[in-house]
Design a protein with these regions (language model features):
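Charged, amphipathic alpha-helical segments
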Residues: 2-9, 87-109
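Solvent-exposed edge beta-strands and adjacent loop segments
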Residues: 2-6, 11-89, 135-147
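Short, hydrophobic/proline-enriched secondary-structure or compact coil segments at domain edges
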Residues: 22-31, 92-97, 114-122
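Generic structural motif
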Residues: 30-32, 97-101, 124-125, 136, ...
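Oligomerization/assembly interface segments of phage tail-like spikes and tubes
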Residues: 80-101, 149-164
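Short acidic, glycine/tyrosine-flanked loop/strand segments centered on an H-E-D-like triad
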Residues: 89-96, 123-142
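Short, acidic/charged, Gly/Pro-enriched secondary-structure junctions
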Residues: 107-130
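Mixed-charge, glycine-accented linear interaction segment located at domain edges/termini
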Residues: 134-182
Length: 182
């Protein structure tokens, strides 16, 4: 007896160039998010609007710039066939060069209180991706060994969500600036 909860959807062959890595990530406390509007009609599956609460202490996303070829995100789906549960572990790995007190403080605030964060990632293909309910789970690195190593921070934020990250395609182009996503 077939048990198809949702009709299958195909993946078309793409002729577009494909690049790895990320250019930038923005975070905002999850509590600052008022509404996330999505289009879940095939083939779009995208975030079309993000509204931040006017009462929130943070009214824009905060930018974290990363250097090329240093940072990435991964998404791994785990399905328990016995319990019938499925979730996606989303991990954003960031590297920040040159250790200094301002960066140390920014990372301390990012992880304070083990708060939930919403993240938007700009990948090397020029696409924005939305990751809700992230938490800072690790920071590391240090001075390096050789002079050429340079000092750096590594930062990991992780979430467990029900679906893969959704592409952000805001219907109002000015909204990117209003949200600080530039």
């Amino acid at each position: 007896m077939p048990n198809l909860c949702t009709a299958l959807e195909g993946i078309q062959k793409s002729c577009d160039n494909n690049s790895g890595g990320i250019y930038q990530v923005w975070y905002v406390p999850q509590d600052s998010i008022d509404v996330v509007t999505t289009n879940t009609t095939y083939p779009d599956y995208e975030v079309t609007a993000i509204t931040l609460s006017p009462a929130a202490p943070t009214t824009q996303f905060t930018s974290f710039f990363v250097r090329r070829n240093t940072s990435n995100y991964t998404e791994e789906t785990a399905a328990d066939l016995i319990n019938g549960s499925t979730f996606v572990t989303q991990t954003i790995n960031l590297v920040f060069h040159r250790r200094e007190m301002a960066k140390s403080n920014a990372l301390k605030i990012l992880g304070s209180g083990q708060q939930y964060l919403s993240a938007v990632v700009l990948d090397a293909n020029g696409k924005y991706w939305y990751f809700p309910y992230m938490q800072l789970t690790a920071t590391g690195e240090g001075s390096g060994v050789a002079r050429a190593d340079g000092s750096k921070y590594t930062v990991t934020t992780v979430a467990e969500n029900e679906q893969l990250a959704m592409e952000v395609n805001l219907l109002n182009p000015a909204a990117y600036t209003l949200l600080g996503l530039v």
